[in-house]
Amino acid sequence: GHAPTLFAAFLYFDLSFMVWYLLGPLAVQIATDLELNAQQRGLMVATPILAGAVLRLLMGFLCDRLSPKTAGLLGQVVVIIALFCAWQIGIGSYEQALLLGLFLGFAGAAFAVALPLASQWYPPQHQGKAMGIAGAGNSGTVLAALFAPGLAALSGWQNVFGWALIPLLATLVTFALVARNAPERPKAKALGDYLKALGDRDSWWFMFFYSVTFGGFIGLASALPGYFSDQYGLNPVTAGYYTAACVFAGSLLRPLGGALADRIGGIRTLLMMYTIASLCIACGGLQPAQLDRCPGPVRRRHAWPRRR
């Protein structure tokens, strides 16, 4: 293995997920200023996620054709330029917010870079743990949920894009200096070889399982700030804290899931996860839907003044 590369992959993944998810914690404040309705706000939040899903194919292809490190550097530069333009030029319309979301999709595609970069250094029996450690970088969503709404309240949500550039530039330099491609990487395949994977029935099943698990995680994480604001009347900062707690739990369990998959197999681990997740979501659906049912002091402390 190569611990510095594993660390670089985690850091790159962590900060990439922070900015990929950035529009979620800022959604309430952006929607208020741009006068967006609920549907527009939802699409704005979903755009980086959808773009990231598609761009993972491109980034995965670049990993094979160039190298994971080169692909990671290119993706980071694109995101940094997009955030710099959003900070300096500003986001003044719904369409501009969607355009920013498209470019932030490159941050979401970091998944296709960080995992191969880290796992290719390790033998098969340890790849689950390596990918779990690198994959724990989705904790970057916790950073966005914790700090983005507060920074927006202090300096304006447009300036949050500028604040995000500081850790991103530090990560870019660290990644360039520390990360190394594995000496025995798989050779690049022809385009037809990629298409053959689509003929494998198991591939479709695993893509479906992944869309439910990780798609559910990032989808809920992006929607929770708006949900807490709409359903419970929480202000954006408090909604960010609540969301961060939910996201942190998922990020904390990811390395444990990788280690468990190494011991008992991926299928059994997925079955356990689906069972537990289904029970938790069912219990969550039984909770009070209105903050009015909470004790008075809690309701007054976290209330968010609504526009009439």
Residue ranges and their predicted role:
Residues 65-76, 262-274:
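Cytoplasmic membrane-interface "Motif A"-like loop-to-helix N-cap segments
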Residues 100-137:
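Cytoplasmic helix-loop-helix junction between adjacent transmembrane helices
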Residues 266-308:
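C-terminal transmembrane helical hairpin of 12-TM major facilitator-type secondary transporters
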Residues 133-177:
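Helix-loop-helix hairpin linking two adjacent transmembrane segments in secondary transporters
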Residues 77-91, 276-288:
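C-terminal ends and interior cores of transmembrane alpha-helices
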Residues 23-27, 202-251:
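Extracytoplasmic gate region of multi-pass secondary transporters
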Residues 21, 49-57, 109, 142-143, ...:
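Residue-level signature of mid-helix packing/kink "hotspots" within the transmembrane helices
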Residues 55-67, 253-265:
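Helix-to-loop junctions at the C-terminal end of transmembrane segments
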